[in-house]
């Protein structure tokens, strides 16, 4: 390594250790730093480029001077008085959204900067936390929702919804808590890759999924010796497409990391030995490389410079289109993996009085109205899947019937539905020889008979003819067949007398639903680029115009729609996203789904889609079910 020092100038050159994949693989990597704003009357604890300004304007957060907008020479253009530290920003239309920590109030603060008029909007504050907030960073998701991550002492972290589109929310909403490393102070988010980066001072840098519906997980970007190449400490970071720049404040070094399809590799290390304690870092990507701002020793000295490094951007998967839930059920009364499968009962005279049924795998069957309010709870055991059909003779009474798979007794639990009030009552139980029952679905052909298909973890399917001639439910086993691996979701097309069934790691099959026909499997769609394992819930949308099969693609938190007739043309995939205006989170890790084409009134005039939500956010609670207007799915996927 060769270092030359000029008056007020640092020239640092790295001649080796570059990745072969970078544009500079065969050339020296030069970082030229010069003192910046040396004679200006402020001391900045945090420094950042104003996004969209081509590096000509900078933001500074100062404990004594407030929040500042500065020109390229460090001259003040605007000031928001106060005591601040920590900075992040995002372009918002013609303005810039700025997040910082207000030291006087001990709260995260957000404001809008009009960079042309050099004026600030009225600040919005995240509520006071019960821990000391050390750092913060912004994240904008694929739908334009704006979040702030808070990094606190002793491993505390939170994600807050603070805006949507170009607007800040008057009242930020807590989305979820995050277990973060102890001794974390800095974070950054790669919006395109939905990656949150957090430092752990004595260990290294970590990457977490940033999406609010993502599961909590982390993977290392780089670690301290002897596990990695970091000499002493992991500090501040800056992100550019395909790359991460990170400071070792005690080892006085700048590390460069190239993102790969899986993980990160070192692209080099630059010595900063002439600095006292490099603590802050901001990067602006230009045509000829990177512009850098470095904060040394708590703002005692500020540096700017250029780095001739252009990391290779990693391809990012295109975002799936999204629809928004308009309603959600109350959370189930059990924690963990509890809510599972919904069904929709349509009131024969008053559709607005229809019901949504939902299974609780740790309790029983739940009944909701169309606003999501719980009306009934039937604690009959660990129910997995549920399905509904109208018109079942329970002795001399004509009722509608719900049937659920009961994992406590490997049986089918039957429930009568009063056709006037919608009230559910237990109506009997049918034992099965399955050792681990999973799914169930109903089939009612034109002759009026009612059949139940029950499946087990070993791939077995049992078809029962249901009846209750004396008021006591009974099931006659009329057919058996089997798939090779674990199934669960299934749904019948009564009109065409077909059964669709999901094999979790394989795909979806179609088979003749008639009891006297051979069970010859025909492939509908395989697990692959569109449908991701596990294949969970299946639902059948039937209308006078088109019939569709809807599938829960649990592996990537999405839903796939295909035509319900051969050749089963793919119509698209979508996600259920966060409804910021209604304060309803999106859905993820979905098990069961259900759909109806019935006109239930209002937003549900073209039908309703119900999906189980495996990760309840905003606030974090037990699992529940989300209600989506089918009309929005039609519009989003341009369904005929």
Residue ranges: model-predicted function:
Residues 1-24:
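Gram-negative bacterial Sec-dependent N-terminal signal peptides
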Residues 26-640:
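Sequence/structural signature of beta-propeller domains
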